[in-house]
Amino acid sequence: MTVLTHPFTPHWQAELELGYTRIGDATRPVLRRHSGPLRVQKHLYPEGSEVCQHIIVHPPGGIAGGDRLDISVTLGPGAWAQLTSPGAAKWYRAASPAFQDLQLRVEAGATLEWLPQETIVYSAAQAELNTRIELHGDARLFYWDIVALGRPAAGERFDAGHFQARLDIRRDDRLIWHERQRIAGADALLDSPIGLDGRSVFATLIASGELDADLLERCRGLPSRVRGDLTQLPGLIVARCLADEALHTRAWLIDLWRLLRPALLGREAVPPRIWST
């Protein structure tokens, strides 16, 4: 009999609340409150004062059963924040669920780039994620999410536990995107052609705006080692992919970001230095 345990025996209850305001031509972090092991490093301005970059860190290094992470981010009118992470978020095997609640609020004229590195869900983990994004007026969003199930390189398939995620995006209180996923360990969808088709990594990119046909085709023609595509919806671009490795997935998303950021946000893509460490 296998007992599901992990050395991180305390149940972490962590909260992080961030707020940004535009002052003149600069975006300034005006709220940074945390409790438990969730925090941000010093704010950075690699592109100048208009774009404030923060790296969200979770010092325990992983999320175990009973843990709860609550993250709330608010951008005031005209602010621009870019949020990323220093490495993969790891959800460990556990006998009880662990939770993450993410709330992102972007006021008119503001821009949020949510660009974390991948989420690795170990076999027998019970990961439950809920994300709510509120856009107001002409607020702009560039969001992605990468999920890796199991650890194939270590010979570990996702054969127990579950991954559950919900994503709601609203603009001016009107629902413009709703998605709900639940994948159980050893689920037939893991290998089904209408599911993950034997791949262990999947990702979604959602950006606000409209693309012209030429740029859409350029994005679709990017060389990559993933199976992916883009769709233009009213006011949203949605990209999805399946892959065997998170590294390939991340490379594809970054290539898309390099093409899309100038067109949608009016700035050339400057990759965060943390991605290269």
Swiss-Prot record:
Pfam (any one): UreD
MF terms in GO: nickel cation binding
Highest taxon of source: Bacteria
GO cellular component: cytoplasm
InterPro entries documented for this protein: UreD (IPR002669)
Assigned keywords, A-Z: Chaperone, Cytoplasm, Nickel insertion
Subcellular location: Cytoplasm
Chain coiled-coil ranges: none
Family: Belongs to the UreD family.
HAMAP family: UreD
The protein's role, per its UniProt record: Required for maturation of urease via the functional incorporation of the urease nickel metallocenter.
Complex and partners: UreD, UreF and UreG form a complex that acts as a GTP-hydrolysis-dependent molecular chaperone, activating the urease apoprotein by helping to assemble the nickel containing metallocenter of UreC. The UreE protein probably delivers the nickel.
Protein name: Urease accessory protein UreD
Organism of derivation: Stutzerimonas stutzeri (strain A1501) (Pseudomonas stutzeri)
Lineage: Bacteria, Pseudomonadati, Pseudomonadota, Gammaproteobacteria, Pseudomonadales
Name of the gene: ureD
